[in-house]
Amino acid sequence: YPRTDARVLSSAVAKEIYKNIGGLNNYTPLSGFANEIMQGKKYQGIIKSKYVDDKKITDHYAIIPTGQAVGSLSRISEMGQKVYDVIARRFLSIFMPPAVYLKIKLETQTKGEAFFANFKMLKHPGYLKVTGMGGQKKEAQLTEEQIHAISSLKKGMPLPVKDYTIKDGTTSAPKRYNSGSLILAMENAGQLIEDEDLR
């Protein structure tokens, strides 16, 4: 059903969602996650979640994998296989717990000048295990030793400054719109207007 823009499921589908999850046990890249969800019965609370809302459905509920004919995936194009994988990962991720990040804000003062640094570290991956989107740039650059050092910081702790560098940089223009981002921007155009009277 390629024309639906629904992002939620109907309550009727939600009642039998375990069938879709069970079908993904045969999809090798995600079978472990599907099995974890089925074994822990993590699908049971879905009907009361934000992912189920009959009022928001127009023609069809959100696209979800049926789990049927997984063996036939090799017959479709590579792009089609990737689309299926994205949809299946997104679908299974709604049954996983949220990702938990540790946010650290450092303020250091030396000779009357204040310097700020912000860090965001992934503490528990949650649904990011399924989507595979947990690798943030800042996180990837931190070593285990640095993560341990940052985690052990306490408020008011004095820190010695061993070295510093000056980095020149320029701001970059916003990314160009593509067909997907343009539609979202048009749907939410009022959010960009700061003047309440114009909004």
Regions found by a protein language model. Give the residues of each.
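Core catalytic DNA strand-manipulation module of type IA topoisomerases
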Residues: 1-199
